[in-house]
């Protein structure tokens, strides 16, 4: 795995990959809206790999450490290097723990697609295949919808929130929700707030006595928000439990409700043809 970010600080490569509580995300200004703060994942992969190699390139220098089953085998020390900044990680799962393991691209591919949908402009390469998105969550709906939308996908975005909405002839509702880039397959407080706020805004726009269930029937939508220090209902992080967007912020329900009240209502007023089809 190779990326081209800033790179791990060269004197911290060993600590970051082997010592607990050495995550780089405690500075709230830089990483306040992350999924995890502690950097546990990389240590777990290291401990459960028969071989693990990590190298960081930064400002013309590099440093690397090799491990076997979590134990240091060798360290390169600082060496000159002309590679672009960023880390490189290579690992082989421990066959005594993961017997007959195999990488399944059909499971990896949806994760990578979601990453590019949530980070417009990001490019990810996997075994020669390229994943890229120019239109964010609009591309996500176009990728995953199994029926044609009845009207052009409504795309709304603001600080720490992105929303797409449309309807189709399918029965029921279909939602995709994300928090800080994490796909919350079980929803949570943000999805509950979105469903309520979207239907309320649509009902108020038309000023008709619609049932909420009728408004949501056939709705296909996605929402992505960023929350400071998110709380999930389990370690799998598939359902958001946070009530507020941050220690000093509004509730998630108010944040999403206020955004949709303004932006979705404005959109429907400005796009009469879409509003007519939705009706």
Feature-to-residue mapping (PLM):
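GHKL-family ATPase ATP-binding module
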Residues: 2-4, 15, 26-27, 33, ...
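Short acidic-aromatic loop segments in the C-terminal HATPase_c
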Residues: 17-21
